[in-house]
Amino acid sequence: MRLILLGAPGAGKGTQAKFICEKFGIPQISTGDMLRAAVKAGTPLGIEAKKVMDAGGLVSDDIIIGLVKDRLQQPDCKNGYLFDGFPRTIPQAEAMKDAAVAIDYVLEIDVPFDAIIERMSGRRVHVASGRTYHVKYNPPKTEGVDDESGEPLIQRDDDKEDTVRKRLDVYENQTRPLVDYYSQWAANGNSAAKVAPPKYRKISGVGNVDEITARVFGALQD
């Protein structure tokens, strides 16, 4: 099982990625983890990436694709892999195709932006314990206060509505085009490509976790 998981921030990709990886015995691969590991190990690509990052630059797609190809050679990828947060752009997707990185499925978890804003901006956290609440779906017994300690809850900066809207704007402009890219490739094929087109599946990410997980596994069966 080799797949790419697509969806907006707050769509629940992280939760479903964990279930998919457990079911199929595959690793979850993120570019951030790969970069950190390569820099720590001092590999040639890691050294190159560190120079760019230390200078405050963005690591090039060529380096990222090189890291991906190295990562896929590792033994834990023999049964497949799940890409999390990669590719983010059409050029990265094209580079993956040119590098003959095989993908069986592209799975999009679709959640309306209004639902994501409500889901994320309603989160409240007890910092010391990490306990999380939601003002609508999982409220504390007393508004704004942790159930166990009686200490105040906070809204993380990442969960503030303005921040959520900005992240969704970035997704809409940068990553949403991948949805069209992969759905068109899956529908039309491309005889010039070095790899077969993936199957493209779209599921609703609205509902409880069990319902969404059932949709995910159903989509990955055909």
Swiss-Prot record:
Domain of life: Bacteria
Any GO CC annotation of this UniProt entry: cytoplasm
Amino-acid positions noted as binding ATP in the UniProt annotation, renumbered to this chain: 10-15, 123, 132-133, 207
Enzyme class: transferase
Record carries keyword Cytoplasm: yes
Primary site of residence: cytoplasm
Subcellular location: Cytoplasm
Catalytic activity: AMP + ATP = 2 ADP
EC number: 2.7.4.3
Subunit-structure text: Monomer.
Family in the record: Belongs to the adenylate kinase family.
Protein name: Adenylate kinase
Organism: Ralstonia pickettii (strain 12J)
Taxonomic lineage: Bacteria, Pseudomonadati, Pseudomonadota, Betaproteobacteria, Burkholderiales
Protein encoded by which gene: adk
